[in-house]
From Swiss-Prot:
One of the GO biological process terms: exocytosis
GO molecular function per UniProt: phosphatidylinositol-4,5-bisphosphate binding
Known function: Involved in the secretory pathway as part of the exocyst complex which tethers secretory vesicles to the sites of exocytosis. Also plays a role in the assembly of the exocyst.
Pfam family, one: Exo70_N
Provenance organism: Debaryomyces hansenii (strain ATCC 36239 / CBS 767 / BCRC 21394 / JCM 1990 / NBRC 0083 / IGC 2968)
Name of the molecule in the record: Exocyst complex protein EXO70
Protein keywords: Exocytosis, Protein transport, Transport
Amino acid sequence: MSFNVDIDEADVAVLNQNLIKSKELFTSISRSLNKISTKSSTASIKIKPILKDVNKLNDNRNQLDSGLNLLSEVSNYASETSKYEAVLNNSIELIGLKKFIDTLTRSKVLLTEMKSNIKRFKGILINFENLIDKSELNLENYFQKSLKSNVMGTNKMNEIILIFQYFYSSSMSGQKTIDKIFMRSQSIKMAEIMRPHEEPTKPIKRSSNIPYEKGSNGINRYNNEMIKAIKGEIGLLNEVGAKINLNASAKDMFVLDIVRKVVNESYAEVIGNFNKVFGQSKILHNDLLILETIENLNHFEKFLNVSNIDVRSFPAFNENYHQLINISSEIFRELIEYSENRVKSVERLTDLNATEAVVELISRIRKLSEYNISLLKLISGMKLGSWLNLKPAVRFISVYTSVIPNLSDDIDETAPEHLLSCFISDYIDSIIINIEIGLKADVSLKKSMQGYYLIKNTILIETIVNRSQQLFNSLGNLGIERLNRLKKRFLKLFLDDWNYASYIIIRDMTTITTTNAVSGHSGSGMSSKEKEQIKDLFKNFNESFEDALRNYEKYNITDVNLRAYLSGEIKKLIMNAYFKLYDKYGSGEFTKNKAKYIKYNKHQFEQILNEKL
């Protein structure tokens, strides 16, 4: 309130009175304001708890709404998991693999979502996670069961691929788990496949006079089944790998891990059993079985290389394999020793028993030569001629060897093929030269007869060689040349009678010519001395020739090839000499009785040779 006071006109009393009234009014207003303030303060104190309760009620209402929403969400998850449990708690066979895996995949997605949204409900999460773990374990067991099947049909293969794809898409841990199960299962399966084939590989004890029948041991079947099983694993991995993007190195690792146990244990034991038997007797007692075994091992080794499987990954297998090679390489020394002893065991060599020995010994090397790969494997790394280092020393070397000096750098004397050719040639030398030694010990045998026995058996050896493609190839050009050198050596001995007849012509014709030149006879006719010399020449030749024919007929040669060869060599030797004699003195001017001395003209001479030879 405001008042306008005119100080000049107002009375002091009035002014004082107005001041007093104003003071009273202000005092009254102050008291009213104090009352209002007191009441406002009291109201404020009383209102605060009410607001707090209201806010609390609002919070509780919000929490209740949130809880109701959470319970609703949990209820939904529980309903969802219940559906999955209904599937996963049943057997895969009943539900079907694809539905089982699809449900399991969705369950894992749901579990991840639940862990994010209802993580406080640990009981629900744990139970559902346990169900998933149990289901994956069931899937692993089903996988193992599927792998045990002996028949891998299309349906079974598709199931295996589905399981692989599931675990390969889950986690690295899942991938490692399924890989481990697969490799272990397949390794066990391979061992079970090979187990029935192990027993038949064990060598059967035989008497020394009973030969091994080719293929009677189970090593061929064992090796073939092993290769077949590994090929099956490779094929399976190729098919599976294409679906799960398995690279080549990973596939090779799979195969190696699968086959390592069966090769390093089963196959190594098979070889070990061979080593025990072979090490207890002469190699020749089991020669064919040894070569058959090595041939299979070599085949297996090559198969591993082609399949990118390092054979060095199997230490026990390799150790036994190398031991087998070391034991068996003695076969070459034993064969040389056997060939000498076989011929030496014949007390008195005849046409019959010499041929029997040759047939027996050459037939043996022919059979062995069929295992060319094995022989090359055994002889590889050996020193040239080391198979002749025997005690007592081999005796044929001191008499003759058909060895041809190597004058060419083109021949690699360390090559297994060259070593094998040299060995076979030495073996043939040992047979035939030992027969020569035995025949020469019989002083009653003429040289020509000795030569006949030797050339006959050399031709027999040549015939057997020519009929055996593998033996012929193993000998090679060098070996055939060495065989020809033996033929030439014995042909010369055989032609001793014919050489003498031919020698008479050459000797006497030379003597007659020389005598005439010395005597200075230059007349148109022959001197008496020359005529007598010519008569003696024809007489001596006829006797020698007829003697050679008689001796030849005693041989009773039935072999067409042998007869053709010998008759050809005889004709080359004797016909040329006789034709020269006939051309010189065939006119018969040296005698009045031509028929007495000149029994054959050229045509007749050739005709009688054709008839008699």
